[in-house]
Amino acid sequence: MSTLDELIQKARHLRSEGHSPGQIADELSLSMETVTWLLTQEKGAATPKDVHIDWTAVSGESQLLVESAQMLLSRLHLKNPEGPVPQVYVGIAISGIPLATLMAVTEGVRIGIYHPAKHAGGDEPIGSMSGNFDIHAGERIVVVDDVITSGKTLQEVINYIKRHGAVPVACCVLFDKRGIRDIDGVPVYSLFKVSRID
C-alpha cells in the first residue's frame, strides 16, 4: 500500500469492519488527525503531513517478529546497561502486545497489556490495563509499542503507570516519527527514527 487512494480505501474498509478511528490509526501507523482526514476528506482539501509505515512484512511473520523483539531488547541493554532491571514489559494494544510478550519471555518476566483511550468508547474514553495482565505498585515497567506517531499514547501510559504506583523505566518502539528522547524523564529507545523532509 503506497498511494493515497489505497490508504483512503484501507481506512474506509477498516471503518466498515467496525474499527474505531484510534484502531485504524494503529493499524495504518498514522496519526488520528490523518485517519480522520482519510475518512472524511473532501476533494481539494490539503493532505496532512504524515508518514505511513507499513511493517506488515515483519509483523505478519513470527520469526521476523521474534528478531525485532530481540533487537529492541539489545537496544535497551546497550543504551541502559546499568539501568534498573524491568519486572514487567507492558505492550500497548494492539501492535505492542506481541513485541512486549516476546521481550518478557526472553527476560523471564511478566507481561502487561495496556488498552489506550483511543480504543475506548464513550463520551470520555480512558485508557486502562487489562485485568488479566495488570501491573502492581512498585514494579519496574518497560513500555513497548510499534510506532510513536505523536507521543500522546506513550504519555498516557506513563501517566497511568505512575498514578498506580509503578515505576516506568523505559519505552521501546520500533519506529519513532517524532524524535522523542524521553517522556517525563522516561527514556525512549527506538530502532528507527522516521523523518519527513518537505
Swiss-Prot record:
The keyword Manganese does not apply. Keywords: DNA-binding, Transcription, Transcription regulation. SUPFAM superfamilies: PRTase-like. GO terms for biological process: pyrimidine nucleobase biosynthetic process; regulation of gene expression; UMP biosynthetic process. Gene3D superfamilies: 3.40.50.2020. One of its GO terms (molecular function) is orotate phosphoribosyltransferase activity. Contains an N-terminal DNA-binding winged helix-turn-helix domain and a C-terminal regulatory domain (or effector binding domain) resembling phosphoribosyltransferase (PRT) domain. Belongs to the purine/pyrimidine phosphoribosyltransferase family. GfcR subfamily. NCBIfam families: PRK02277.1. HAMAP family: GfcR (MF_01214). This is Transcriptional regulator GfcR.
